[in-house]
Design a protein with these regions (language model features):
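Flexible "cap/lid" subdomain of the alpha/beta-hydrolase fold that forms the substrate-access gate
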Residues: 2-6, 13-15, 25, 53, ...
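Alpha-helical elements of the RecA-like P-loop NTPase motor core of helicases
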Residues: 36-40, 195, 269
């Protein structure tokens, strides 16, 4: 598989974008602490049928490090502008972790643009449904990352050990390919790189407000798939079900948070029939099953 890297200006920001394949567009939005290489093991499976668009999100990897704009609404605008810059008028959108809230808001705002939505291993703001997951509070690093300047001052010079912890925990101890690991460590090394990544957490109150406002005035009409693993499980599906017209939910057993690197084959088995354009075999049947364990 051939992957082309391009710098694309979108919403006023230079984004580093990996492009592969031809066909209907599939936009992949990574989370923390990732870059476009998060999708390394699923690109082959998707690029045979789709034009895969995998950016480094604003402030991450080789994309521009901006002073602000890390709220879900601005990130959704980045994604919309990226599709427009690449000449796409319709796309399936797949988000994981920090990529989920902007993917959700893009689908809410532009159901004419987003033909399928897949969201994984995240919560969408403070929508009801995640009470059990949050019973003991949010994961410890949320508060650590949210305090301005704190995490950067503690972690600068120790980024590799910190990233390794997330990669190990996110694959249930399996770890990731050394080349991918090294790419992530490089992308998140340095005080400014850390500031940008932690700005996602510092923007969570605004992102939550944007999500609450979106569901107050509209429903999610785009066919949607919610995929959970460890630790989020079915919490995302439970949040989405009251506000979504067409939703399928899946929880992957024995799978860590970083689904595309830990269980790429199982992820592809879910994505391939769901992402199929309207009229293709299996494109609609996926919406009839709820809470399926994988």
């Amino acid at each position: 598989m051939s992957v082309a890297l391009r710098q694309v200006k979108a919403n006023g920001v230079e984004l580093n974008v990996a492009l592969a394949g031809e066909g209907p567009a599939v936009l992949l939005l990574h989370g923390f602490p990732h870059t476009w290489q998060l999708w390394t093991h699923v690109l082959d499976g998707l690029a045979g049928r789709y034009r895969v668009i995998a950016p480094d999100l604003r402030g991450c990897g080789a994309s521009a490090r901006t002073a602000g704009g890390y709220d879900a609404g601005t990130l959704a605008a980045d994604a919309e502008a990226l599709l427009d810059a690449l000449g796409e008028t319709s796309a399936a959108v797949v988000g994981i972790d920090a990529g989920t809230p902007p993917a959700f808001l893009l689908a809410m705002r532009r159901p004419d643009l987003v033909r399928r939505l897949v969201v994984m291993e995240s919560l969408v703001g403070r929508l009801p449904g995640a009470e059990e997951f949050l019973a003991d509070g949010a994961p410890w690093w949320f508060g650590f990352h949210a305090e301005p300047g704190l995490a950067e001052s503690v972690l600068t010079g120790h980024e590799d050990r910190y990233i390794d912890w997330f990669l190990d925990a996110g694959t249930l101890g399996q770890g990731v390919d050394p080349a991918v690991r090294d790419a992530f460590v490089h992308a998140y090394t340095g005080t400014e790189a850390l500031r940008c990544s932690f700005s996602y957490y510092r923007a969570l109150p605004e992102s939550s407000r944007q999500i609450q406002e979106a569901v107050r005035t509209a429903r999610l009409t785009v066919p949607t798939m919610a995929i959970g693993a460890h630790p989020v499980g079915s919490a995302l599906e439970q949040q989405l079900r009251p506000v979504t017209d067409h939703l399928s939910g899946h929880v992957m057993e024995n799978c860590g948070h970083i689904i595309p690197l830990h269980r790429p084959d199982r992820l592809l088995a879910l994505l391939e029939p769901f992402l199929a354009p309207a009229g293709s075999t299996g494109s609609r049947g996926q919406l009839q099953h709820h809470g399926r364990r994988q």
